[in-house]
Amino acid sequence: YIYDRNGILLADNYPVFTATLSKADIEDMDDTVKRLTPIINLTEDDINGFNSRVKASRKTERVTLKLNLTEQDIARFSEVKFQFPGVEIETQMTRYYPHGELFAHVIGYVGRINDKELKSIDKDSYAGTNLIGKIGVEKSYEDLLHGFPGYESIEADAHGNILRHLGRKESTRGNDLYLSLDYGLQSIASEQLAGRRGAIVAIDPRTGEILALVSSPSFNPNLFVTGIGHADYSALRDNLDQPLY
């Protein structure tokens, strides 16, 4: 979690339902994805991201197809689950920024791990998550904020029956981070820039701490967490006021 200097929550974690596929249990991955598309409303971005993750994953890994399934997605899949061996609905933690645009330029956001990042990270440390810090505080303090997944090793026979448990390691949650920013001052600075282009930085002259850092216009970082759609990204990218910068 990320907090301001007074303990106000700036970046939260919450559980979402995700569709994952087992490479070991699915012979025709493309056909499975095609049949799942109308059931859980897969977009082109969902499919392209999944294909990239499949190529970079190991044979024994489960690969996330879609994050943040709706209740309707889950209900439709539940009715036909027997037709999709190797496909499961799981719960994963994802990031949420409760104040939206207010801290976007300083906190940044997390997003799905891309092909370049997959080559540089320790895959074991990121098992069970698809998210990594992209910009701002989230990227600068990724190593501190990111926890470590747990695991259980077992020995099984050819039919999947467990013969014995070989070992278990509990997961470790990431560290909390307290910033020098002050939510109240950040809000006042944002109000002063409402409807205008510009930036405000407030610094405590005694300590050098940054108390507020606002750039206007801003953007909603929550759009990037589960994968921003093409239309939303184009609107931000092509905006003459350049909210992403």
Question: What is the role of each PLM region?
Answer:
Residues 1-245:
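Periplasmic/cell-envelope proteins involved in peptidoglycan metabolism and beta-lactam response
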